[in-house]
């Protein structure tokens, strides 16, 4: 079947509606809050009437039927459908702040309890438990520090690459701001020589020629780059054979400005001919 289906799930307040808007802008026929039990019949019907790209969003309000989703997606794959799964997430403190700012109730907050409505943090923990099986199967996008426009751009970038090949997402980040929740592999490069302590390089980034020249001259940097590249060379085929659509490789240094940026750029250049590759610089891009 000549059809691509994108299924968006995730935590309430994580930005699922924004992601769905990105898909709508990209030409997908989109439906929000689709009951999971209708997924297969909906996809088949929309394929007959609206073309070859369909996107649906589901949330925890359909919790009792969510266990049906993995089986339905497996059935679609057996029919030759290209299925992509995205799971949007954010840290609890960010989700609490978003609910406070919008003054919206959590979908599970009014579930019947003897003591009354559930406290928000308790509700969020329950939601995480209910959605855990879907999270394990999906590409996770951490929206904790993403503005709406950045999330729109990132989703469009993810879906602009062919679905038939593994997509490698290389991401630089600063440990002082925390490790991203969507990383599959995290490499700590804080032990490498730091251009921050070179006065002429401090204001530059790992994309700038003087910083690139400086780091290329450091034997430890070359060794780290080779070790990470060799590790990925060894295991990416196995991940692709295991039907992984996306793999996020996060490289972290102290400030997310020099060393991690340089390594992300070099690794992306190494693998872009073999796999779909995307670059993200969390601190530089304001992500």
Curated annotation (Swiss-Prot):
ATP binds at residues 10-17. The keyword Ion transport does not apply. This is Nucleotide-binding protein Ajs_0902. GO terms for molecular function: ATP binding; GTP binding. PANTHER family: RNASE ADAPTER PROTEIN RAPZ (PTHR30448:SF0). Pfam families: PapZ_C, RapZ-like_N. Belongs to the RapZ-like family. Disulfide bonds: none annotated. Displays ATPase and GTPase activities. InterPro entries: P-loop_NTPase, RapZ-like, RapZ-like_N, RapZ_C. It comes from Acidovorax sp. (strain JS42). Keywords: ATP-binding, GTP-binding, Nucleotide-binding. It comes from the Bacteria. GTP binds at residues 59-62.
């Amino acid at each position: 079947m000549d059809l691509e289906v994108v299924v968006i799930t995730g935590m309430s307040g994580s930005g699922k509606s924004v992601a769905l808007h990105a898909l709508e802008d990209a030409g997908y026929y989109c439906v929000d809050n689709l009951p999971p039990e209708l997924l297969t019949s909906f996809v088949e019907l929309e394929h007959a009437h609206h073309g070859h790209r369909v996107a649906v969003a589901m949330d925890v309000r359909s919790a009792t039927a969510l266990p049906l989703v993995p089986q339905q997606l497996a059935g679609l794959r057996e029919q030759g459908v290209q299925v992509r799964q995205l799971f949007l997430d954010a840290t609890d403190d960010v989700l609490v702040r978003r609910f406070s700012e919008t003054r919206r109730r959590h979908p599970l907050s009014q579930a019947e309890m003897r003591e009354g409505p559930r406290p928000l943090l308790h509700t969020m923990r329950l939601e995480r438990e209910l959605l855990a099986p879907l999270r394990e199967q999906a590409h996770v996008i951490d929206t904790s520090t993403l503005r709406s426009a950045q999330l729109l751009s990132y989703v469009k970038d993810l879906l602009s690459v062919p679905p038939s090949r593994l997509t490698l997402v290389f991401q630089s980040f600063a440990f002082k701001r925390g490790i991203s929740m969507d990383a599959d592999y995290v490499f700590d490069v804080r032990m490498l020589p730091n251009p921050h302590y070179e006065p002429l390089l401090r204001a530059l980034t790992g994309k700038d020629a003087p910083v690139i020249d400086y780091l290329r001259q450091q034997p430890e940097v070359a060794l780290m780059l080779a070790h990470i590249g060799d590790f990925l060379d060894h295991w990416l085929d196995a991940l692709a054979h295991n039907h992984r659509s996306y793999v996020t490789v996060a490289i972290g240094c102290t400030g997310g400005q020099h060393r991690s940026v340089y390594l992300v750029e070099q690794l992306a250049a190494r693998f872009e001919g073999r796999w779909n590759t995307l670059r993200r610089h969390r601190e530089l891009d304001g992500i």
